């Protein structure tokens, strides 16, 4: 998993509340267990018309936001089913940070396991960031995980809180497998001691 230390990029505004995982990645895209290729299905029902053509009114289809790395969204983002394809689709599109006032718990935790930083802010701060994100090609935000700070295009900054363990994992690019590998030496030592003290169990 790629480390997340500091991210600077275009932030796309999506001022919609209760965006569920079915909206993020419709069920038609859930047949695969691969993490790649799902970006094309991200927000598919909103991004595409019935004939498959792009909906020019959807934010991620607008030229200024096609390469967005940050999403500023309404309250209760990621509610609905627990499909891990939702963060996979965001990541495959190129989005590594989602900012909202609240997230569904399962989606929130799945983000950290996939290298995405979900940030919770107050409604006042979200309104400011949503305004920043509405500046089109000038909607550049910098998310500094080391200092727990978001800097807007005008130079103003917003602080955010994050669990220390989750922060450690993102800064070091550690998913569940990475965390286990990090303890590899201790696991090997335990197995040697356990085999010596319980030879009948070997």
Swiss-Prot record:
E.C. designation(s): 4.2.1.33
GO MF entries: 3-isopropylmalate dehydratase activity
Gene Ontology cellular component list: 3-isopropylmalate dehydratase complex
Alphabetized Gene3D superfamilies for the sequence: Aconitase, domain 4
Reaction it catalyzes: (2R,3S)-3-isopropylmalate = (2S)-2-isopropylmalate
GO process annotations (BP): L-leucine biosynthetic process
Pathway: Amino-acid biosynthesis; L-leucine biosynthesis; L-leucine from 3-methyl-2-oxobutanoate: step 2/4
Keyword set, alphabetical order: Amino-acid biosynthesis, Branched-chain amino acid biosynthesis, Leucine biosynthesis, Lyase
Stored InterPro entries: 3-IsopropMal_deHydase_ssu (IPR004431), Aconitase/3IPM_dehydase_swvl (IPR015928), AconitaseA/IPMdHydase_ssu_swvl (IPR000573), IPMI_Swivel (IPR033940), LeuD (IPR050075)
Subunit structure, interactors included: Heterodimer of LeuC and LeuD.
Family note: Belongs to the LeuD family. LeuD type 1 subfamily.
HAMAP family from the UniProt entry: LeuD_type1
Function: Catalyzes the isomerization between 2-isopropylmalate and 3-isopropylmalate, via the formation of 2-isopropylmaleate.
Protein name: 3-isopropylmalate dehydratase small subunit
Provenance organism: Rhizobium etli (strain CIAT 652)
């Amino acid at each position: 998993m790629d480390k997340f230390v500091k991210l600077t990029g275009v932030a796309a505004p999506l001022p919609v509340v209760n965006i569920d995982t079915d909206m993020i990645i419709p069920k038609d895209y859930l047949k695969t267990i691969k993490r790649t290729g799902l970006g094309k299905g991200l927000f598919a029902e909103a991004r595409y018309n019935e004939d498959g053509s792009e909906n020019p009114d959807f934010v991620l289809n607008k030229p200024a936001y096609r390469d967005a790395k940050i999403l500023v969204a309404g309250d209760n983002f990621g509610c609905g089913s627990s499909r891990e394809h939702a963060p996979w689709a965001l990541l495959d599109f190129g989005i590594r940070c989602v900012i909202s006032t609240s997230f569904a718990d399962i989606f929130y935790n799945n983000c950290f396991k996939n290298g995405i930083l979900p940030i919770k802010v107050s409604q006042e701060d979200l309104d400011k960031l949503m305004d920043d994100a509405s500046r089109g090609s000038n909607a550049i935000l910098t998310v500094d995980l080391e200092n727990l700070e978001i800097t807007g295009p005008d130079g103003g900054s917003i602080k955010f809180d994050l669990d220390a363990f989750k922060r450690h994992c993102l800064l070091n690019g550690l998913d569940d497998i990475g965390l286990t590998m990090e303890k590899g030496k201790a696991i090997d030592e335990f197995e040697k001691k356990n085999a010596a003290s319980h030879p009948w169990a070997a």
